[in-house]
Structures are given as structure tokens and as C-alpha cells.
Amino acid sequence: MTPTIMTDLNQSTESQKRKSTRILIAEPDSDIHVLYSLFTKQYGFSISDVKVVQNGNKCLEIIHSNRNDNNNNENNDYDIFIIYTHLSDISGFEVARKIRNRLPHKRIILTTTYSLDNISSMIDSIGIKSQDVLFKPFIYSDLVSILKEPGRSYN
């Protein structure tokens, strides 16, 4: 049985051919890396479709290499970015802002321990909807619900 998310997120409108949805996650906590890997694998994503990095600079480096090297198979373009706001090297908000500036149509999901009241102006300025913010600790079904939502246009 094919998981719903694979059908919803990976259906190509240009052809019948299936395109994998790729997810890049910036999260400093290695225990949470394991959870993301389990969650996404359980929901039908292959290991090659999901990459988890420990900091914002590595995330931005991957994005930069994608844009400059079209033959780089390891780092093909990502469709969804899940960014923790409390990264150790650079603010997750800054990472999200740089992604939005470079890739304006890509989906960005923030994870945070801040309350929505404390970050609403920051997410508005980046162009992230409050529905695309996960508040830690979150449960698996919260992540699935966000991933199941159709992608949004951000212009």
C-alpha cells in the first residue's frame, strides 16, 4: 500500500512519472535526527529523499551547491525545508530567510520552542504561514499533517 503522502506530495502534473519529494532538515539534536529519519521512513520517504544536517551553514552550503552544480546527484534540489529556529551556528530564521530569497517557491517549515506570539512578526517577514510552524515538542501526526498539506506558492 502506497502511503498517502507519497501520492499527495510526489504526483507530477507534467507527466505520469513519479518525482520524489526531497526534504532537507536542519536540526542540531542528534536524537531528533533519529526521530525525523524514523518518521519520514515510516511515512514512505526513502533515505535518499531526506537529509538531516546539524547546522544552518551546512544547510545553506547544500542549497548553494545545488544551485551551482546541476550534475550533483547527491544534492539534488529539495522541495521542503524543515528548519529549527535555535540552530547553533546561525539563527534558523536567518536560514529560512536566505532559503526564501534564493528559492522563493520552496516550502519552509519551522520548528521552534518559541510561542507563536513571540515569532509571528519574524515568520511574516520571511513569508512563512503560521500553519507551517511546528512547536516542540511535537508529535508525529503534527509533522504528517503539515507534510500532507499541498505546497503553497510564495510570491
Where are the regions that the model predicts?
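The feature encodes the CheY-like receiver
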Residues: S88
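Active-site residues of response regulator receiver
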Residues: I83-T85
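Acidic, metal-coordinating helix/loop segments flanking the phosphotransfer/catalytic sites
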Residues: S37, V52-I80
